[in-house]
Amino acid sequence: MASAREPTEDEIAKFLATRTSSQILQLMRCIREPAAQFAFTAKLLTFNSVKSAKPTVPPKAKKALNAFVGFRCYYIAIPAFKQWPMKKLSNLISLLWDRDPNKSLWSLMAKAWSNIRDQVGKDQAPLDEFFDIICSHLKLPDPASYLDLHGWILIVNDQGDPTLVESIDSKSASVGSSHIDLALSVEDIIAFVRNAGYAPTYIPNDNITSPTFLGQLANSPALEEDQAVAEEYDTPMADTSSASEFQQSLQREMAITEAAASVVGPDPLPDFDFTPFYESVNNLIVEHMAMEQANAGYTQGTQLSNHLVVDSGKAYLGMNDFVVDLPELIDYDAFHFGGNEDVTLPMFDDITYY
């Protein structure tokens, strides 16, 4: 049986150097003899302290490229600016940015480049190469033609500093919008530069939905299903939709026509026989009231040609004891202009209601 050997000096040093603080304290508690504790403590003083493992802190996300910074990095290469130091060009670049009509495009380009840089690194995503590719595609003016295209003239003021003034006579001074008329997204820009050979190691995220309306419409599953059904039956979708709308419109028109035809006049009589007599009575009452109001200025008892009376001796519709004498049925004196307000209105207790 092999006898246990004592560890070497190097093995002991390696063992102690790889222990944690809690393990070192546990070893010290196991040593009972004071001399051994002293020797062990002295040995520990010659080693570097072993720190407890700390959780790995994830690296902070890099700051996204600002749209103005990208604009400045691209147009600082304007040939007329090369003879001036950067501190004299800051105000000029700010003025150009304030009047530039393509700020929205620069925001999209800055966001697209930031996404590429965060994945592949800055070394694999040179900014100048990115702008050379995408600005040419978007038909943005290059640094050499920017001032002339937007009607700017670089002059030197009395203090010897560069100054930009607008050329009123220049036809290009009225440029106020981008030359491109497309609905772009960040993903569209990334896809174009990758197809041009920029940042080939970048892996796009296929789960990201395009924020543009055209991108959402093209990726819509419902639209794909409708198109597949239309192709299967070889039937234009627009024709089917028009036929359905026409049928619904026809049904609405028929319903309106039927509802209008059902209204034939006033409420029917109890025996559901529409008799012209009741219409005549209604007209006589209305005309009589209007005539009495018109004749209010005459004295009471004056015989007028418009004083209408219905013959009370004739019965109508077989109703028993039905007599009509409109002047005696209602006393309108109370309603005359300046009439007697104390007039007594007739009582109707003796009238039988059917």
From Swiss-Prot:
Where found, per UniProt? Answer: Nucleus
The answer to whether keyword DNA-binding applies is yes
Cellular component GO terms, alphabetical: nucleus
- Chief location: nucleus
Q: Which UniProt keywords apply?
A: DNA-binding, Fertilization, Nucleus, Transcription, Transcription regulation
Species of origin reads: Cochliobolus cymbopogonis
Q: Which residues bind DNA?
A: 60-117
InterPro entries per the UniProt record, alphabetical:
MATalpha_HMGbox (IPR006856)
- Give one GO biological process term: positive regulation of mating-type specific transcription, DNA-templated
Similarity section: Belongs to the MATALPHA1 family.
Query: Per UniProt, what is the name of the gene that codes for the protein in this document?
Result: MAT1
Annotated Pfam families: MATalpha_HMGbox
Name of this protein: Mating-type protein MAT-1
GO MF annotations in UniProt: DNA binding, bending
Cite the PROSITE patterns for this sequence.
ALPHA_BOX
Its transmembrane ranges are none
- What is this protein's function per UniProt? Mating type proteins are sequence specific DNA-binding proteins that act as master switches in fungal differentiation by controlling gene expression in a cell type-specific fashion. Transcriptional activator that induces the transcription of alpha-specific genes.
